């Protein structure tokens, strides 16, 4: 199927438009589990964002700094990424779409959420015994992220690497790249 994928990750400025448009208060953009998560935890913005004295600030390793509007949005959950994509009239790319297109855009600043559940590759067979049981636990309720981040070791920074997190986690350096079917 034909699709297009954004040349850049969603920026803080673009994500701020979602917040200002009431994106965190509009259930139409959220998975039902995501909507429950937002309301239960009273989520109103990405992790480490703080609205202080009429300006958005971002807590960083260097302390609290003004939000860098042109930087990729960071520390968001799959639920937030999905809702932003729905609000923007787009979608998250699948894992396969991201990998096929990855030579056409710059990646590596943020782990990028995909619309793909973390499942074994075709033909995968779980090993017998404890190792199989241990590995099998990771393939439950996880979503795939592709790319790498500024904090990723060189050995894991490759376009084929599959990372995975639970959809509610706002893990280190997670971001958004949009796709759409054409």
Regions found by a protein language model. Name each.
Residues 6, 33-52:
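Short acidic-hydrophobic catalytic motif
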Residues 69-70, 74, 96-107, 116, ...:
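Short, well-ordered junction/capping motifs at the entry into regular secondary structure
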Residues 129-132, 163-164:
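Short beta-alpha connecting loops at secondary-structure transitions
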């Amino acid at each position: 199927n034909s699709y297009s994928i954004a040349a850049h990750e969603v920026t803080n400025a673009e994500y701020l438009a979602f917040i200002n448009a009431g994106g965190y208060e509009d259930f139409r953009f959220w998975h039902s589990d995501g909507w429950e998560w937002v309301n239960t935890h009273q989520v109103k913005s990405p992790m480490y964002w703080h609205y202080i004295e009429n300006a958005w600030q971002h807590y960083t390793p260097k302390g609290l700094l003004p939000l860098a509007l042109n930087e990729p949005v960071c520390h968001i959950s799959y639920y937030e990424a999905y809702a932003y994509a729905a609000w923007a009239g787009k979608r998250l790319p699948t894992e396969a779409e991201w990998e096929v297109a990855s030579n056409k855009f710059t990646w590596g600043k943020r782990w990028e959420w995909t619309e793909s559940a973390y499942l074994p590759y075709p033909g995968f067979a779980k090993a017998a015994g404890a190792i199989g049981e241990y590995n099998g636990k990771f393939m439950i309720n996880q979503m795939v992220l592709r790319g790498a981040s500024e904090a990723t070791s060189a050995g894991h920074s490759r376009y084929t690497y599959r990372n995975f997190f639970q959809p509610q986690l706002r893990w280190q350096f997670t971001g958004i790249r949009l796709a759409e079917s054409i």
